[in-house]
Regions:
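Hydrophobic membrane-insertion alpha-helices, especially the h-region
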Residues: 12-33
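Secreted/periplasmic serine-hydrolase-like ester/acetyl group-modifying domain
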Residues: 131, 140, 144-252, 344-384
């Protein structure tokens, strides 16, 4: 009988210690809230710098968009995250807005975040969706931090709640949040409050303050090597269907939907050519236009051919453009101060003008290549 009581007491003590330990961990992580999903008030010098949000983009954005009653949204990949500002004056009557683009997303993920937004944000009136070639690659699978269960609801998914309060990664992120908040209290982190990425933090933390040419080289090599980018490519019918679902739902809901192809730098389009995917690139555009008119900012125009030198006005590297260029994109799409936009930047593609436009890009490419053999060789040298 005595042994039985001893075991019982031991078990109760163990449960109590475990419960207290877990409560302390949960309280610690809840206070520092490294992914900004709990909503803990911030205290300067302790928990206000949320740089760890970068490792839980899909989680924090799914939660953040629920808090603002958005009237306008941006969707797409990290190109949209960097380039489009929700406070653009052309959207002044559609505030608040939120940049719901997700890093490295495929078209299915983008569609599901669209579904999430319209399920929880009944006031959404306008959506601007950026489309990228790699988003439609059959090899581009859902990222590990994508979870269906967190979408379509305003409530925090139980699995996510465990992840942010009791997991080891969250504890490490909380410690880093304390360190970052204490050592650099005025640092905005990787994201602004409206979901747009901070290019300065990315250049510092991801590219380690390397110059623009090393950044171009790093990104282009990555695109040429990775099979889910340009390493291999097969246009996904399923992803085209996902886009069509977004178009159809927007029409049914009375949401103004603008589609556009990102204005990455000319060297990014050279990488597609070097990868042997130019015909697939054009086939992708044909497939898009078959679904809806779409603004095309790609190609070798007066903006995408900006000279490569430190510093660059419009580009972080070959793939990502800055807000300064994104403002011109929005000027064109929203017909806001159109006189500020170069005439060759942003063409609305329809079945009527598509083939002529594709031919013009080929001619522009030949002229650019003749004038820039150094950069043609630069990209060709990166081919694996």
């Amino acid at each position: 009988m005595s042994n039985h009581k001893d075991y019982r007491c031991y078990g109760l003590r163990l449960l109590t210690v475990t419960a207290v330990f877990l409560a302390l961990i949960a309280g610690f992580n809840g206070f520092f809230d490294p992914y900004q999903v709990i909503g803990t008030p911030t205290i300067k010098g302790l928990n206000q710098v949320k740089r760890e949000k970068d490792i839980q983009v899909r989680l924090f954005k799914a939660v953040a968009v629920n808090k603002i009653e958005a009237k306008s949204l941006f969707l797409g990949s990290s190109r949209t995250e960097f380039g489009l500002d929700t406070h653009h004056p052309g959207l002044s009557d559609l505030q608040p807005g939120y940049n719901l683009a997700i890093t490295g997303g495929n078209m299915y993920e983008v569609r599901r975040y669209f579904d999430h937004a319209i399920a929880t944000q009944p006031e959404v009136k306008e959506i601007i969706l950026s489309l990228d070639f790699f988003m439609f690659n059959q090899a581009k699978k859902n990222t590990p931090d994508f979870r269906e269960e967190r979408l379509g609801t305003r409530n925090l998914f139980v699995g996510d709640l465990f992840e942010v309060l009791l997991s080891k990664p969250a504890f490490i992120s909380s410690l880093r949040t304390l360190k970052n908040s204490f050592s650099r209290p005025n640092n905005p982190g990787f994201f602004y409050e409206d979901g747009r990425r901070n290019p300065d933090s990315t250049i510092e933390q991801v590219y380690f303050n390397q110059g623009v040419i090393p950044r171009f080289r790093m990104v282009l090599r990555d695109f040429l090597v990775r099979p889910d980018l340009y390493g291999t490519y097969q246009l996904s019918v399923d992803y085209l269907n996902d886009l069509n679902a977004v178009i159809t739902t927007s029409q049914q809901r009375g949401i103004r939907l603008h589609l556009f192809i990102s204005p990455s730098h000319a060297l990014q389009w050279e990488a597609i050519r070097v990868a042997g995917l130019w015909s697939e690139f054009e086939a992708w555009k044909r497939a898009l236009v078959n679904l809806s008119p779409i603004w095309d900012f790609s190609g070798y125009n007066s903006m995408t051919t900006e000279a490569i030198a430190d510093p660059m006005q419009y580009y972080i590297e070959s793939s990502h453009y800055r807000k300064e260029l994104g403002d011109l994109v929005l000027n064109r799409i929203l017909d806001y101060r159109p006189e500020t936009v170069p005439s060759d930047f942003g063409i609305l593609l329809t079945p009527t003008n598509l083939e002529t436009h594709l031919e013009q890009i080929r001619r522009d490419r030949e002229l650019w290549a003749q004038e820039n053999p150094k950069w043609v060789e630069f990209v060709e040298a990166l081919k694996p």
